[in-house]
């Protein structure tokens, strides 16, 4: 809150006062501290009562001020009054920009007496004031004082007899204690007084003022802080992806694969940055808190508070059904990994937030699970596992089990590894180091160097299988037999358990379903009435074959059956309360049961992960009937603690529907079926910010529209930039049901200075060229997917294809390879037998279901159209429409260690023909041919294989850089040994800014020592002056080293809402 009071000692010489209270005061103790600081600040002002009667003016303010709510900064309020001798402005919960603007106004005021009071939640170590967005520290204050405009105006003003006096009251500890009153360059122009002693007595006017401020600072209710969505609907994230949120002073990320979700930290802002995404999920399966800090827990604690408030409201009852459903929308929580211990303080400290988190978790019936590195050899915790889909492992690198210090104080460093079942799909490795010192992080990685999947930039299960490839036929046969066995052995369990769970969940999902039924007739305008076509092909192939394989009749024929199955109550089956979690096939349409004890104990999580925490999480919603038998097979087979994800198939026989873009894989896959491409769909390693989308939980497989921004070099941007809509191959299955699609668009934000950089076309990555105007056009054109696309069905808003239509080709690539060729299947081979799985459920009208795909820049340059607005989504007949989606494995390519999207700098990663237009669009499904990869299998030699030499590098797909006090310790050695396709710099604190340049220079030096030409993307979550300067000075080296720097303001748009985030798809 900022209050500005301007009074005048003489009528012509006014005085000024500015009070600032930042951030939400979320607890009573913090509110009392803020009020004490305000009182201290006002009473320390040595203004002459003859100049301004402060007591009287404060009384006038309380009775006559006006209140204004900011339309730009939601949650910010200003209270203002201008009297004869005093002008008062109070900003409640301001953003950092608002505070700096008001501070400039105060400095430029001609008043001879000025007071600045900084009060509010602040960090214990540095004293940095926490605001709604960002913080305010002495460094920010000096930056404002050093502003050229302010200095020039102050210097040009005729010097008064005595220079204006600015009194500042602020925290008395941390960096504020070291702020010198004498600011260079302001001597004789402005006199500063820091934290003077209290001089004025307490007064009635001051008491009234503080009472009114206390009322204005009442913390918002959890429902006001985390608002319900405008429309109810559940999302499903199928392909491996990671949302990178601006966590304020800390980290906030969200990893998802095949419907299994992991929230990593919560950020420092109580208005949780991840809320607008997770409120559309029915469950967050795991919460990983890397460290108990004020930079990582406030956002999570807000979510926990809301869950408690929802529970109380649900118990109290009342309210209309639809309204209650919208309010009681927060996802159920699974296991919570948290190392913490209790403490208490009025300042914002990690220990306080940890104590609060422990208390809230206890009230919710969730027992946090501490993490530490176990004995060697390192064994992972299996978070999720499903046959035919894959396995998600978590390796803990720090703290060690035998740590000398209390492990509750040590930061957790965790490595998530997704092992897909498809032999040619990419293994995904994501590192969340928290505040772990780099030296300890590297020590933890040494214990994992025996793992083959860390030795190569791109690894697939078939690489790791190596010599066992000859056994594929036998393996396929054994899988088939297991499937048959599963069908005969466990027929009844699903039909008993699921309806019970569904019945329990039904209240939460009644409204979304009802809304869907009402909305769909008006939205399905032009559906292709071919009911049989979609059913004659596997879903993966149908997805590749058409942008919109519609057919309203198909959905009408089957949807009612599959939708009602979960809701049919079976007598004698009590609702599952604390048993295994409801399978997603029911969670897709139904919300998870509101159990109070949601987390499974750690021993169960490790020993039988497949049964408790992962068995159900990968099932597709449409797999009610067709997939239940295979699921039973899974339940029988997954008792082992570390079963293999899937036995490799022959080279040409890829496993059927893998969970890349739709949750379809329920059973072991048959040999000979074309499968997904293994190349990294990493959508970020060179993407400037990606277009992304969650998938509806109500839908078996969502229509995956490859709606992306491929940024050509600046020279070509004006004429060749445009949105492309490539068709995805089997890896990204297109839906055969008549879904209406609301685009979920990520507005990329390339680094601001890129226009001044003359970039050569070859080494340029898509993220390093093009300006933000095109993206702002796009964002402006798509303020909400639901508002622009809903009136028309998908078949109207996208290039429409049916199974009988020829696949479109991009201009200039008449024979673009839709290519099953890229998936190990000859282009003209007959399609495989259709999968025996019912079609997906209809989609609720509020669901966002777009899968971001990336095309290489070469393909982007072939496409016409100079606009990146939503216009290209019109029908192909439109003259300005960019080419129809090229029927290719664009998504796969987009992830190719990102070098493939530039001019494919990976030396041996692509064959010479890959530089051609066709080759750039369809690659072999196997791993990108990486430089020095040895014979098949050498890349991913199993854990028992040859040991890597100490200090050898490890390859990751995405890695956060250590934050907190460890950020400044990141050096060249770290980047030499931790080689990631994407690095995320998060944590906008003062020390991070001070050490930023050294870290960025270390990145350049470390990358220069890599023996492989890999494209690297740097993703900052905050704006940094040091980074801007570094970018301008070193951008010429970025091209040579293959480094792309993104901006910090990427935006994801879903429906009629948007939130800041950068989505990285793998």
Curated annotation (Swiss-Prot):
The modification Phosphothreonine is found at residue 647. Its main location: nucleus. Residues 967-1066 are annotated as: Necessary for association with actin. Residues 462-707, 758-950 are annotated as: Disordered. It is found in: Nucleus; Cytoplasm, Cytosol; Cytoplasm, Cytoskeleton; Cytoplasm, Cytoskeleton, Spindle. This is Microtubule-associated protein 1S. Belongs to the MAP1 family. GO terms for cellular component: cytosol; dendrite; microtubule; microtubule associated complex; neuronal cell body; nucleus; spindle; synapse. The modification Phosphoserine is found at residues 320, 472, 582, 649, 660, 665, 667, 737, 765, 816. Residues 720-973 are annotated as: Necessary for association with microtubules. GO terms for molecular function: actin binding; DNA binding; microtubule binding. Residues 656-671, 880-894, 933-949 have a biased composition (Low complexity). Disulfide bonds: none annotated. Residues 676-1066 are annotated as: Necessary for interaction with RASSF1. Residues 466-487, 500-530 have a biased composition (Basic and acidic residues). Residues 974-998 are annotated as: Necessary for the mitochondrial aggregation and genome destruction. The keyword Membrane does not apply. Residues 597-614, 766-775, 790-803 have a biased composition (Polar residues). It comes from Bos taurus. One of its GO terms (biological process) is microtubule cytoskeleton organization. Heterodimer of a heavy and a light chain. Interacts with microtubules and actin. Both MAP1S heavy and light chains interact with microtubules. MAP1S light chain interacts with actin. Interacts (via C-terminus) with GAN (via Kelch domains). Interacts with ESR1, LRPPRC, RASSF1, microtubules and VCY2. Interacts with ESR1, LRPPRC, RASSF1, microtubules and VCY2. Interacts with WDR47 (via N-terminus of light chain). Keywords: Apoptosis, Cytoplasm, Cytoskeleton, DNA-binding, Microtubule, Nucleus, Phosphoprotein. InterPro entries: MAP1 (IPR026074), MAP1B/S_N (IPR056617). The keyword Ribosomal protein does not apply. The gene is MAP1S. Residues 832-845 have a biased composition (Pro residues).
């Amino acid at each position: 809150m900022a209050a500005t009071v301007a009074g005048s000692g003489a009528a012509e010489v006014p005085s000024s006062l500015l009070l600032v209270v930042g951030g939400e005061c979320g607890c009573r103790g913090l509110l009392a501290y803020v009020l004490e600081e305000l009182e201290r600040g006002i009473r320390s002002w040595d203004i002459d009562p003859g100049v301004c009667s402060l007591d009287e003016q404060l009384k006038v303010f309380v009775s006559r001020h006006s209140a204004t709510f900011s339309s730009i900064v939601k949650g910010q309020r200003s209270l203002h009054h201008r009297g004869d001798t005093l002008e008062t402005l109070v900003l409640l919960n301001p953003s950092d920009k608002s505070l700096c603007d008001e501070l400039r106004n105060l400095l430029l005021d001609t008043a001879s007496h000025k007071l600045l009071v900084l009060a509010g939640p602040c960090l214990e170590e540095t004293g940095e004031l926490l605001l709604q967005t960002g913080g305010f520290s002495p460094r920010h204050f000096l930056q404002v004082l050093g502003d050229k405009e302010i200095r020039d105006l102050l210097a040009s003003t005729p010097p008064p007899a005595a220079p204006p006096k600015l009194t500042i009251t602020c925290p008395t500890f941390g960096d504020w204690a070291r702020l010198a009153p004498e600011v260079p360059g302001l001597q004789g122009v402005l006199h500063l007084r820091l934290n003077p002693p209290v001089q004025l007595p307490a007064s009635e006017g001051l008491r009234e003022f503080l009472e009114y401020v206390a009322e204005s600072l009442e913390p918002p209710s959890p429902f006001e802080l985390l608002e319900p969505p405008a429309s109810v609907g559940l999302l499903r994230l199928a392909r491996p992806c990671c949302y990178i949120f601006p966590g304020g002073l800390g980290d906030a990320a969200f990893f998802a694969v095949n419907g299994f979700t992991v929230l990593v930290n919560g950020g420092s802002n109580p208005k949780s940055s991840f809320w607008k995404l997770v409120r559309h999920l029915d469950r967050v399966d795991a919460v990983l808190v890397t460290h108990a800090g004020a930079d990582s827990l406030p956002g999570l604690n807000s979510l926990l508070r809301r869950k408690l408030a929802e529970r109380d409201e649900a118990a109290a009852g009342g309210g209309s059904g639809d309204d209650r459903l919208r309010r009681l929308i927060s996802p159920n929580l699974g296991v919570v990994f948290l190392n913490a211990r209790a403490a208490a303080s009025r300042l914002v400290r990690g220990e306080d937030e940890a104590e609060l988190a422990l208390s809230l978790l206890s009230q919710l019936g969730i027992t946090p699970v501490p993490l530490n590195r176990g004995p060697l050899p390192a064994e992972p915790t299996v978070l999720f596992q499903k046959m035919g889909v894959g396995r998600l492992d978590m390796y803990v690198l720090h703290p060690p089990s035998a740590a000398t210090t209390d492990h509750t104080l040590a930061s957790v460093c965790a490595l998530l590894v997704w092992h897909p079942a498809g032999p040619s799909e990419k293994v995904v490795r994501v590192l969340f180091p928290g505040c772990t010192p780099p030296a300890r992080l590297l020590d933890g990685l040494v214990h994992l160097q025996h793992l083959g999947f860390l030795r190569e930039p791109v690894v697939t299960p078939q690489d790791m299988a190596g010599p066992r490839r000859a056994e594929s036929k036998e393996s396929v046969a054994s899988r088939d037999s297991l499937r048959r066995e599963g069908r005969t052995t466990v027929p009844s369990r699903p039909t008993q358990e699921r309806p019970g769970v569904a019945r329990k969940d039904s209240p939460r999902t009644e409204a979304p379903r009802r809304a869907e039924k009402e909305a769909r007739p008006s939205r399905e305008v032009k559906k292709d009435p071919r009911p049989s076509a979609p059913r004659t092909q596997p879903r993966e192939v149908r997805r590749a074959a058409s942008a919109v394989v519609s057919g309203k009749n198909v959905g009408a024929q089957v949807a009612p059956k599959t939708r009602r199955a979960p809701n049919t109550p079976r007598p004698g089956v009590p609702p599952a309360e604390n048993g295994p979690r409801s399978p997603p096939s029911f969670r897709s349409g139904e919300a998870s049961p509101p159990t109070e004890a949601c987390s499974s104990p750690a021993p169960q999580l490790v020993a039988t992960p497949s049964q408790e925490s992962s068995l159900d999480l990968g099932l597709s919603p449409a797999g009610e009937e067709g997939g239940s038998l295979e699921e039973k097979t899974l339940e029988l087979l997954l008792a082992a603690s570390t079963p293999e994800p899937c036995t490799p198939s022959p080279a040409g026989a890829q496993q059927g529907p893998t969970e890349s873009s739709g949750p379809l894989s329920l059973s072991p896959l048959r040999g000979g079926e074309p499968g997904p491409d293994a190349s990294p769909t990493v959508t970020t390693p060179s993407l400037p910010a990606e277009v992304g989308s969650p998938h509806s939980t109500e839908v078996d497989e969502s229509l995956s529209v490859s709606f992306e921004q491929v940024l050509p070099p600046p020279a070509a941007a004006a004429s060749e930039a445009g949105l492309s809509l490539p068709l995805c191959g089997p890896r990204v299955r297109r839906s055969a049901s008549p879904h209406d699609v609301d685009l979920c668009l990520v507005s990329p934000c390339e680094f601001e200075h890129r226009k001044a950089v003359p970039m050569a076309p070859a080494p340029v990555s898509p993220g390093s060229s093009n300006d933000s105007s095109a993206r702002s056009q796009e964002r402006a054109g798509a303020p909400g997917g639901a508002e622009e696309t809903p009136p028309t069905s998908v078949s109207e808003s996208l290039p429409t294809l049916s199974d009988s239509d020829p696949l479109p080709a991009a201009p200039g690539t008449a024979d673009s390879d839709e290519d099953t060729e890229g998936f190990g299947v000859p282009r003209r081979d007959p399609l495989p037998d259709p999968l025996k799985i019912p079609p997906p459920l209809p989609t609720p009208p509020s669901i966002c279901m777009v899968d971001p795909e990336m095309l290489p820049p070469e393909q982007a340059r072939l496409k016409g159209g100079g606009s990146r607005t939503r216009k290209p989504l019109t029908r192909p007949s439109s003259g300005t429409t960019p080419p129809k989606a090229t029927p290719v494995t664009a998504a796969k390519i987009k992830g190719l260690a990102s070098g493939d999207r530039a001019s494919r700098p990976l030396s041996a990663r692509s064959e010479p023909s890959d530089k051609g237009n066709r080759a750039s669009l369809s690659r072999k499904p196997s791993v990108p041919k990486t430089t020095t990869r040895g014979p098949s299998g050498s890349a991913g030699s199993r854990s028992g294989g040859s040991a890597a030499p100490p200090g050898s590098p490890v390859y990751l797909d995405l890695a956060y850089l250590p934050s907190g006090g460890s950020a400044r310790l990141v050096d060249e050695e770290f980047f030499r040994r931790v080689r990631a396709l994407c690095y995320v710099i998060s944590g906008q604190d003062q020390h991070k800014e001070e050490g930023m340049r050294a870290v960025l220079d270390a990145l350049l030096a470390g990358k220069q020592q890599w023996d492989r030409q890999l494209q690297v993307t740097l993703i900052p979550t905050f704006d940094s002056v040091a980074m801007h300067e570094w970018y301008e000075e070193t951008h010429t080296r970025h091209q040579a080293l293959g480094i792309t720097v993104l901006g910090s303001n990427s935006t994801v748009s879903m429906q009629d809402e948007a939130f800041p985030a950068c989505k990285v798809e793998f």
